[in-house]
Amino acid sequence: MRHVLIAVILFFLSIGLSAGCAEAGNKTQNQSATEVNASPLQPAEYFIYHNLMNDKGLIKTDFSDQPSYLSESLGLWMEFLLSKNDAPHFQDQYQHLTDSFLMSNHLVTWKIQNGQASGTNALIDDMRIMLSLDQAAAKWGRSDYAQTARDIGTSLKTYNMNNGFFTDFYDSQAASKDVTLSYVMPDALAVLKKNGIIDEETEQRNANVLYSAPLKNGFLPKTYSSETKEYTYDSEINLIDQLYAAWHLPEGDEKASVLADWIKQEFQKNGKLYGRYSAYTKEPAVQYESPSVYALAVLFLTKQHENSSVIKAIYDRMNDFEIHDPVKSYYGGYMSGTQTHSFDNLLPLLAERKLFNENIIQ
């Protein structure tokens, strides 16, 4: 019922979106108001268009007077638009990628601030963007997307590897030495192999950083060293890191099952998930919650085909952080007081779209 009501509300709220999107797209939007309104916006989607997008169509990280624009936001937004089958807005973001984020070496700058692009990338964002471009090329028959995906992939192999492993970043001088496990994206590695950029051995070597990682007291390692070939475990785990890595595990994976069981037990016991836990006692180390934690839990458990009632309960808790009153200025936003972060809106948006696409929610 909630989603039917929201769809009705957004039909009227989105009447003004065509003007907002035209401004947000810096006059590059070609959709008519009818086309824009044909698919009702999710509340968080409405919030992003009206509160986080600047007049050029770039997503701000927060409400700072000197906003930054992250490749993380770009990649998550592109992934969402792809999942929604929104080709026109995906094209707009592709234009921002090539105009603003893609560096001369064909890696993606991780941050733009005060008009200056950092010379450093972030592996997970490059991988996500490359994967989205490859999938969009197949979906919409766009050879330019496919070529840009190949260009990014080739540069990742050239610059972002150490001792045969893709590592966290390249800072214009050298690749880093460590691999954060949540940065390992097997689907993106498969694209690199498909495009002839890496061979099967390299694909498997890098995927095995995640697949072969041993659990310690039920938790995944934080990093893997490309130098020592050893894993490092945190004494206090960040649940976002754990869930991101777990989301990338194969369906039915044994480690994924262990983590899924703990997530379900923790949520059923406390009715919530906290941001950080002791790796030894498994007790909460903080008292804060995060919409992103719930979003990743939804994405992870959905991929593992867990019980839909548990997934919906976690989704409902995530939605407790969203502003539902359409007369509020920040309607649709996942807010902490008067503050927000793009990450905490984009991941819930992506998780909600996944549940729509899987018919878990209506």
UniProtKB/Swiss-Prot annotation:
GO terms for biological process: carbohydrate metabolic process. It is a lipid-anchor. It is found in: Cell membrane. Keywords: Cell membrane, Lipoprotein, Membrane, Palmitate, Signal. InterPro entries: 6-hairpin_glycosidase_sf, 6hp_glycosidase-like_sf. GO terms for cellular component: plasma membrane. Residues 1-20 form the signal peptide. A lipid is attached at residue 21 (S-diacylglycerol cysteine). It comes from the Bacteria. A lipid is attached at residue 21 (N-palmitoyl cysteine). Its main location: membrane. This is Putative lipoprotein YdaJ.
